[in-house]
Curated annotation (Swiss-Prot):
It comes from the Eukaryota. SUPFAM superfamilies: omega toxin-like. It is found in: Secreted. InterPro entries: Delta-hexatoxin. GO terms for cellular component: extracellular region. Its main location: secreted. GO terms for molecular function: sodium channel inhibitor activity; toxin activity. This is Delta-hexatoxin-Mg1a. Disulfide bonds join C63-C77, C70-C82, C76-C93, C78-C105. The presence of a 'disulfide through disulfide knot' structurally defines this protein as a knottin. Residues 1-18 form the signal peptide. Pfam families: Atracotoxin.
Length: 105
């Protein structure tokens, strides 16, 4: 009889202890998820800011008073062509002579 009571008490303690541990684990998991989610949001904001900065720096200037560096004709404004210079291996926007007389792009 004592053995049966001890076994029942042990079983109840194991079940109660398991539920307590499960609740603690759920709370820790929830806190961990919230912490990681907030960290992920901060990282995404930083990534967006860095990408925006890179995009701003990589844009080609158009229609400046000085020569603008270009990669293709579409990087230059109306009346300019993207001309490659062999001496510095770079292309820049230069005014078309035809535009001076006709005004067409």
């Amino acid at each position: 009889m004592k053995t049966l009571v001890i076994a029942c008490v042990a079983l109840v303690l194991v079940v109660v202890h398991g539920e307590v541990i499960e609740e603690v684990n759920e709370k820790q998991l929830q806190e961990s998820v919230e912490e990681k989610y907030s960290l992920l949001q901060r990282l995404e904001k930083l990534d967006e800011a860095i990408t925006a900065e890179e995009n701003r720096n990589s844009r080609v200037r158009r229609c400046g008073s000085k020569r603008a560096w270009c990669k293709e004709k579409k990087d230059c404004c109306c009346g300019y062509n993207c001309v490659y210079a062999w001496y510095n291996q770079q292309s820049s926007c230069e005014r078309k002579w035809k535009y001076l007389f006709t005004g067409e792009c």
